[in-house]
Amino acid sequence: GVIPCGESCVFIPCISSVVGCTCKNKVCYRD
């Protein structure tokens, strides 16, 4: 995960996980 998805995942999971984003350091990233 190197590209920020512009979404945080402090309280809820990454909604953007449907496009390959994963939670890292409270922020959603994708490869």
From Swiss-Prot:
Covalent cross-link Cyclopeptide (Gly-Asp) as placed by the record, residue numbers: 1-31
Range of residues in the leader sequence: none
Described function: Probably participates in a plant defense mechanism (Potential). Binds to and induces leakage in phospholipd membranes, particularly ones containing 1-palmitoyl-2-oleophosphatidylethanolamine (POPE).
Keywords, ordered alphabetically: Disulfide bond, Knottin, Plant defense
Family matches, as Pfam families: Cyclotide (PF03784)
Domains (record comment): The presence of a 'disulfide through disulfide knot' structurally defines this protein as a knottin.
Origin: domain of life: Eukaryota
Keyword Disulfide bond: yes
Disulfide bonds listed in the record: 5-21, 9-23, 14-28
Organism this protein belongs to: Melicytus chathamicus
GO terms classed as biological process: defense response
Family that this chain belongs to: Belongs to the cyclotide family. Bracelet subfamily.
Protein name per the record: Cyclotide mech-5
InterPro entries according to UniProt: Cyclotide, Cyclotide_bracelet_CS, Cyclotide_sf
Disulfide bond is among the record's keywords: yes
Post-translational modification: This is a cyclic peptide.
